[in-house]
Amino acid sequence: MESNSIIWSLLLASALISSFSVNAQGPAASPVTSTTTAPPPTTAAPPTTAAPPPTTTTPPVSAAQPPASPVTPPPAVTPTSPPAPKVAPVISPATPPPQPPQSPPASAPTVSPPPVSPPPAPTSPPPTPASPPPAPASPPPAPASPPPAPVSPPPVQAPSPISLPPAPAPAPTKHKRKHKHKRHHHAPAPAPIPPSPPSPPVLTDPQDTAPAPSPNTNGGNALNQLKGRAVMWLNTGLVILFLLAMTA
């Protein structure tokens, strides 16, 4: 139902748009109005075209058309027949109205560029000084002198012995005093050791002859170590008995 109403509204809108375009194109006159008015036509030509009746068949919807969104239906409009198109009056083609000469489009006034001033004339170069008088002709060159003869090297002289100045006389020796032998201070001789008194007689005790107990790293002796082992085994047995009594 909604699709039918949308199609009817589209058909009515297209009919109204076509009638408006005909009305707008009918009374349009030529752009240039002539000074002489054309005589009115004797008989009005009947309209050659008639408005076609609205078709009831719905045009097929193309597959590419998107689904119409739900819109509110337009208000009900009674289908009215479009008005007959207005036809311009028939003008005889034999006598076209005179048209005034078409004037060219008014263009913006062209602004002529300012006249370019000619470049200043180059200043005349300063007058060159008067050329000096030509120099007198150079005298003719002297004749070439012969090459000098090779000079023989002077004879080598034997080296003369170098004379040394006389050595100065030795200074008189001073009388040296002989140092006396110094006595070295030696340590005094040690005092004599007095003889020690005789030692008392040694008494043999049977306890002294007994072997000493073997040392223990824990700070005790072998007897204490044996006693500790017995205590350890006793404690282990008591713990086992206690556990058996708890589980029974």
From Swiss-Prot:
State the residue spans of region: Disordered. 25-221
What segments bear the compositional bias annotation Low complexity?
25-37
Where do Pro residues bias regions lie?
Answer: 38-57, 67-86, 94-171, 189-203
In its keyword annotation, does this UniProt entry include Lipoprotein? yes
The way this protein sits in the membrane is described as: Lipid-anchor; GPI-anchor
**What are its GO cellular component terms?**
plasma membrane; side of membrane
Tell me which UniProt keywords the record has, alphabetically: Cell membrane, Glycoprotein, GPI-anchor, Lipoprotein, Membrane, Proteoglycan, Signal
Basic residues composition bias: residue spans? 173-187
What tissue specificity does the UniProt entry give?
Answer: Strongly expressed in stems, moderately expressed in flowers and roots and weakly expressed in young leaves.
Lineage, top-rank taxon, reads: Eukaryota
InterPro entries in UniProt: AGP19
Q: Where is the lipid attached (GPI-anchor amidated serine)?
A: 196
**Signal peptide positions (record):** 1-24
Q: Where are the transmembrane segments?
A: none
Q: Which family does it belong to?
A: Belongs to the lysine-rich AGP family.
Name listed for the protein in its UniProt record: Lysine-rich arabinogalactan protein 19
Q: Which gene encodes it?
A: AGP19
